[in-house]
C-alpha cells in the first residue's frame, strides 16, 4: 500500500518559496495522496486593540486569514493548475505547534512536512522552537525539508539503536527500516543505508582500573553491535555493504556518514517520553539533528501518545 496519502504541509509565512510544499508535491507525483497546506498565524497587535469591539476584532482577524489564504493559493497556483489536490487552511492561533498537532490528529494526517531553515555560513540546519515541539510531540512522522533539490542518486540513511536491550527499541528499529524501505521503493528506488554508532572506552576507566584492557572492551562492544546489525539487516534482506557500524558519538558518526554518502535524508526514531531517542538517550538525538545538512524524517513508535490534546474551542 502506498504510504503518506494524507500529507500536511506547514507553510512558512516569511517567504514566497515553499520547499516543504515542493517536497510534498514531489511525493504526490510518485505515490499519490492529497496535500493540506496549513498556516497558523497570530498577530498580538490585533488582540491589543481595545478600541475595537469583539465583532470588529473578529472581522480584522478574518481579513488577515483571507489575505493569507489568497497568498498561499498564489504560491500553489502552478500545482493547483496542474491538478495537484491541495487544500488550503489558515487558522488564528498563538501556539503554532499545538494547533499543527491538533490538525494532524483531527485530519488523520499521516505525514507532516515543514521547511528547515539553514544557517547561511555553517550550512547546518537551524531548528526553531516550533520545530523541536513537533519533532518531540507530533504523533505522525515529521519530515524537515532543507531548501535544496533532492541530490542526484541521494540515499536514505536510517539511524538505528543497536545497544538497547529494551524490546520497544527493537520494534522501533524495525519500524524505521520497514517504512524507509517502503518509501524508498516508491520514490525512485532510493538506496537505503543503516547506521549504528557504538561508544569508545571512557578514558577514566582505563586510568582507574589498571588491569582494564580498553581494546578488549572495544572489540566486545563492536562485536555486540555488529551482531545486532546483522540480525536487523537479515530480517529485511539488506546487503551488508549498505550497513555501517561506526565507533564514536552518534552526533558525529551520523552527520559525517550522511555527508560522505551524500544522503538526501536521515531517518531517526524518537521515543516520546525521553524527548528524541532511538539511536540515543537524552539529548543526543537533538545534537545529531543540529549537525545534519540534509532532510530529516522523524518517526515515533506505534504506541506513542502525544501530550497535545484536541482543542474543544471552535475558533
From Swiss-Prot:
It comes from the Bacteria. Belongs to the universal stress protein A family. NCBIfam families: PRK11175.1. Gene3D superfamilies: 3.40.50.12370. This is Universal stress protein E. Required for resistance to DNA-damaging agents. GO terms for cellular component: cytoplasm. Keywords: Cytoplasm. It comes from Salmonella typhi. The gene is uspE. SUPFAM superfamilies: Adenine nucleotide alpha hydrolases-like. The lineage of its organism: Bacteria, Pseudomonadati, Pseudomonadota, Gammaproteobacteria, Enterobacterales. It is found in: Cytoplasm.
